[in-house]
Every structure is written in structure tokens, then in C-alpha cells.
């Protein structure tokens, strides 16, 4: 959250070199709000990579792949051309929706019966998508792609709307037990204004999702053609590292 880091590891997982760029572009238009221009995340990523290449002794042609890991729960809304419609809402943002979509009566009754109705309402109030739909309905109507930050950076690297199942931490219609988007009948699709077409394809961590193109290679200094591999959200990666 505080910075972007570019890290070089060997095939045994040993850290060989790193560079770090502080993120100083966060904005708080109102108390409790926290946003950042998605393009600012990208520029910081590019700067960190270029700083790494400027001082490392590791040859670029020895690098074999790229993995992106990001802060969890930060959301990005894009239009049909893949352009950001508004600043990214950061996971620390405290705004809450007050007008939430109604659930069908049978879901409402079932959730009430098992004592989960208030929990689902909390989920709805916390969901960034519900806040945007309530307060910026014209913008939400133009939203063609709704991504977590990891999905946005994967898109910038590869031109594909693909993300890792291990990065889906946030108020999105994800089935955590099965590791996929929720089934069409699931209450989450009624609790949120998100359509399935807005969401990225999900793949397991470790899957090759694309490759570095010429434009990205120029911006980041990462060699063109390297595979981009699905990673995991920051907390998940930290937990794995501490095992």
C-alpha cells in the first residue's frame, strides 16, 4: 500500500535485488475516502522496474518470468475501451453504500433463518460497487470491466482481462470454497450490481496468462516476450513466505 517494489528472485526463491518507489499520489477528497489514479499505480510500477535495472548486476536476459502481487481489495472500474472511469477505491476507503439492492424473498428468508441476514447487509454496505452504483449511476452504467488492482495490472501487462483466484479478496461475487466466480443462482449476484461480463477470467496461481509486449517492455525495461504468471494477493504471499 505504501510503495511499489520490483523484486528479482532466483529459481530457489532467494531475493537477488530490489527497488522501491513510494506511492505519494493517494487522494482523500472527503474524510474517510482514499483513492488513487490507476495510471499512477502503473507509473510507479514502471519507475520501480526501471530503477531496478539501473542498479542491478543481474542480467536482464536471465529473467524467465514476471509475477504481479498487489494490495488486496482495491477496485478499478474501466469502460469498454479499458480506460479507467474513476480513481481506484483503495482497500482502506471507509465510505459505505446506504441504498443496497434487494435480495429475492427466498434468499432473504433463508439468510434470516440462519442468522446471516445482517452479515449479508454488511457485505452490501461495504461493497465499493454498490457505492458507485448509488452515487455515480451514470458512471456505473458505463462500467464494462470491474477489476481488483491485480486484474488491472495484469491487463496492463498482457492486454487480457485475467486474474488469479488467489487474488480475489474483496467485495466481489467470488466462491471461496470452489475458487471460482459464484454460481448464477448465488445471492451475491443479487447483493451487488456486478454482472459476470464485467469480471475477469480466473485462473489458478502459477498459470501463464500472457506475455510482456513491446510497449510494456519499453515502459518497464522487462524483456519483451517473457511470460506473465498469475500470482496472489499480498497477504497470501506473506503468509506463504512465513510458513
Describe each PLM feature range:
Residues 1-87, 142, 217-227:
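N-terminal glycine/serine-rich phosphate-binding loop of ATP-dependent small-molecule kinases
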Residues 12, 112-233:
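Gly/Ser/Thr-rich active-site cleft segment
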Residues 27-29, 98-102, 175:
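Short, charged, surface-exposed secondary-structure boundary motifs
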Residues 80-85, 102-110:
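Hydrophobic or amphipathic alpha-helical targeting/insertion segments
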Residues 93:
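Carbohydrate-associated surface elements
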Residues 237-238:
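Thiamine diphosphate
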Residues 241-243:
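Alpha-helix C-terminal capping segments
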Amino acid at each position: 500500500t505504501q510503495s511499489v517494489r520490483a523484486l528479482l528472485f532466483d529459481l530457489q526463491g532467494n531475493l537477488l535485488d530490489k527497488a522501491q518507489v513510494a506511492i505519494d499520489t493517494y487522494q482523500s477528497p472527503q474524510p474517510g475516502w482514499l483513492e488513487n489514479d490507476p495510471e499512477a499505480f502503473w507509473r510507479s510500477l514502471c519507475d520501480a522496474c526501471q530503477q531496478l535495472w539501473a542498479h542491478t548486476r543481474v542480467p536482464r536476459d536471465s529473467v524467465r518470468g514476471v509475477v504481479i502481487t498487489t494490495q488486496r481489495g482495491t477496485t478499478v472500474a474501466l469502460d469498454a475501451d479499458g480506460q479507467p472511469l474513476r480513481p481506484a477505491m483503495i482497500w482502506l476507503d471507509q465510505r459505505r453504500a446506504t441504498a443496497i439492492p434487494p435480495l429475492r424473498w427466498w434468499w432473504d428468508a433463508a439468510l434470516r433463518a440462519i442468522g446471516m441476514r445482517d452479515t449479508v447487509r454488511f457485505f452490501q454496505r461495504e461493497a465499493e460497487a454498490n457505492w458507485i452504483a448509488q452515487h455515480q449511476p451514470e458512471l456505473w452504467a458505463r462500467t464494462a470491466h470491474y477489476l481488483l488492482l491485480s486484474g488491472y495490472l495484469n491487463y496492463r501487462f498482457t492486454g487480457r482481462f485475467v486474474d488469479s483466484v488467489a487474488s480475489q479478496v474483496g467485495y466481489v461475487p467470488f466462491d471461496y470454497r470452489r475458487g471460482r466466480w459464484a454460481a448464477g443462482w448465488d445471492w451475491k449476484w443479487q447483493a451487488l450490481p456486478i454482472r459476470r461480463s464485467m469480471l475477469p477470467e480466473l485462473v489458478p496461481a502459477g498459470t501463464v496468462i500472457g506475455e510482456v509486449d513491446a510497449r510494456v517492455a519499453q515502459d518497464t525495461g522487462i524483456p519483451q516476450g517473457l511470460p506473465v504468471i498469475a500470482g496472489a494477493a499480498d497477504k497470501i504471499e506473506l503468509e506463504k513466505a512465513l510458513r
